[in-house]
Amino acid sequence: MIVVLDANVLIAAVAGRGLCEAVLECCLEEHEMIASTLLIQDVRDKLLGKIKVPPPIVQEYCDTLRKNSRFVEPAPVPPDACRDPDDLHLLGLAEASGAVYLVSGDKDLLVLGTYNKTQIVTPRQFWDCVRGNASKGGGLP
């Protein structure tokens, strides 16, 4: 399945153990992740700046993302497609790649619910869709 992970999910996967890390691992192992140079740069800048992750760890992480993602040129998206113009890039990636899911914690994206054929979901919603809920034995450990 083709999946776009928002920078906030990719950052949270490094910043702490938990759901976003599990979502990333699931995508790396079982799905086709979509990325762009701009998305990886955004992750890199925020990890180095706001989060203060040591540069060698950031480099290794970004290299892993590059090696395990299909890079796509985003499709054009109408400027009024979402509230935050910075999110147009992600919608363009989802559109160009034919992504089934765009996984994000960004309310400006989540309020859309879908964009064309892509479902826009939280990390929890994605996890529940691909793993089932904990009562079915597929939840987070």
Roles of regions detected by a PLM:
Residues 1-35:
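Short, well-structured N-terminal submotif of metal-dependent ribonuclease cores
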Residues 6-7, 35-36, 105-106, 122-123:
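A secondary-structure boundary/capping signal
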Residues 12-14, 46, 112, 129-130:
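Residues that scaffold the ATP/ADP-binding catalytic core of kinase and kinase-like folds
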Residues 19-20, 58, 86-87:
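Amphipathic coiled-coil/heptad-repeat helices and related helical stalk/stem segments
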Residues 26-78:
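PIN-domain endoribonuclease scaffold, especially VapC-family toxins
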Residues 30-33, 98-100, 118:
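Short active-site oxyanion
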Residues 67-102, 107, 111:
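Active-site neighborhoods of divalent-metal-dependent phosphate/nucleic-acid chemistry enzymes
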Residues 81, 88, 107-141:
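Acidic, PIN/NYN-like endoribonuclease modules and their adjacent C-terminal/linker elements
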